[in-house]
């Protein structure tokens, strides 16, 4: 009996010593990170294509979090896309304000990782950091299928993996919607009778607002409009 107790005691002490020794070792935690360049690092390391959007990100003050770990999807316009955009708005990289740069970055950026395989014809499941949803659709261009984003630009290089998300290169700078649903209906003459009905019922004023860019506060409308 004493012999069995001695063996049991020795085994217990041995286990405690092993446990103590193991617990004293430095624990190496596995973080959910990557050795890939982050989004900002990637665009900055490709100045032949992305020097303009890099300058815009720098001016926006968002370089810090775009170079930190997270889960983002960014539609990155090429230098030629930014050049076209700046000509359209009569601006240069120098004359863009910080607020304008921030809005450009925010309309191209989602706090989610979305591959093109998850795109469907219509609204993406996550709003941009600007607060508006982007829409995508497949178009046929000379026998080649391409993805059109917001009816403004096509994806020219997709699913570029970075340490904090994905990049989809686009050939145009995306622009946020500037008109309310009511204004879009008014601008199309084939909805003239429907517009009158909206005004008569008081709903025209309800949908004639572009409110907060905060996605938590913004109200969204879907109108099934009848043509004349």
State each model region's role.
Residues 2-8, 16-228:
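Mature, structured domains of secreted/extracytosolic soluble proteins
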């Amino acid at each position: 009996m004493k012999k069995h107790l001695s063996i049991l005691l020795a085994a217990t002490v041995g286990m405690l010593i092993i446990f103590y020794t193991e617990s004293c070792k430095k624990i190496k935690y596995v973080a959910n990170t990557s050795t890939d360049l982050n989004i900002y690092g990637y665009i900055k390391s490709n100045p032949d294509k992305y020097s303009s959007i890099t300058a815009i990100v720098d001016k926006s003050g968002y370089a810090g979090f775009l170079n930190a770990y997270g889960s983002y999807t960014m539609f990155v316009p090429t230098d030629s896309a930014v050049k076209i955009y700046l000509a359209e708005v009569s601006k240069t990289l120098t004359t863009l304000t910080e607020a304008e740069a921030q809005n450009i970055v925010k309309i191209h950026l989602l706090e989610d990782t979305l591959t093109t395989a998850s795109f469907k014809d219509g609204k993406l499941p996550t709003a941009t950091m600007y607060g508006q949803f982007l829409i995508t659709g497949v178009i046929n261009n000379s026998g080649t299928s391409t993805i059109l984003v917001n009816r403004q630009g096509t994806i020219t290089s997709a699913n570029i993996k970075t340490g904090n998300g994905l990049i989809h290169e686009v050939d145009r700078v995306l622009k946020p919607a500037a008109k309310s649903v009511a204004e879009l209906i008014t601008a199309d003459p084939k909805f003239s009778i429907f517009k009158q009905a909206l005004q008569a019922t008081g709903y025209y004023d309800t949908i004639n607002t572009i409110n907060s860019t905060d996605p938590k506060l913004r109200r969204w409308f879907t109108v099934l409009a009848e043509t004349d």
